[in-house]
Amino acid sequence: MERINTRKALVGSVVSSVNDKTIIVAVDIYKKHPIYSKRFKKTKRFAAHDEQNKAKIGDIVKIIETRPISKTKKFRLDKIIELAKEGN
């Protein structure tokens, strides 16, 4: 029987990189209200493992689900999609 890769992949921006090998990524999730059908934005913050400390604040990154690394870290950095603009 073939095993299917069902890991979640999320794209968001880095809002904190203070801790060693850890980044906090804010992911915007758009939902639709079940009764009123209005779309609204919900922002969730995920702690992700960054082994080489590459990501900086403002970068757009892709994180993927992995085994639990600590109490709050269940994602790891997959790749940096876009670097933060300098001077802002």
From Swiss-Prot:
GO CC list: cytosolic small ribosomal subunit
Keyword tags: Ribonucleoprotein, Ribosomal protein, RNA-binding, rRNA-binding
Transmembrane segments: none
Single GO MF descriptor: rRNA binding
SUPFAM superfamilies named in the record: Nucleic acid-binding proteins (SSF50249)
Keyword Plastid: no
A Pfam family it matches: Ribosomal_S17
GO biological process, one term: translation
Subunit structure: Part of the 30S ribosomal subunit.
Annotated function: One of the primary rRNA binding proteins, it binds specifically to the 5'-end of 16S ribosomal RNA.
HAMAP family: Ribosomal_uS17_B
Record family assignment: Belongs to the universal ribosomal protein uS17 family.
Record protein name field: Small ribosomal subunit protein uS17
Species: Mycoplasmopsis pulmonis (strain UAB CTIP) (Mycoplasma pulmonis)
Organism ancestry: Bacteria, Bacillati, Mycoplasmatota, Mycoplasmoidales, Metamycoplasmataceae
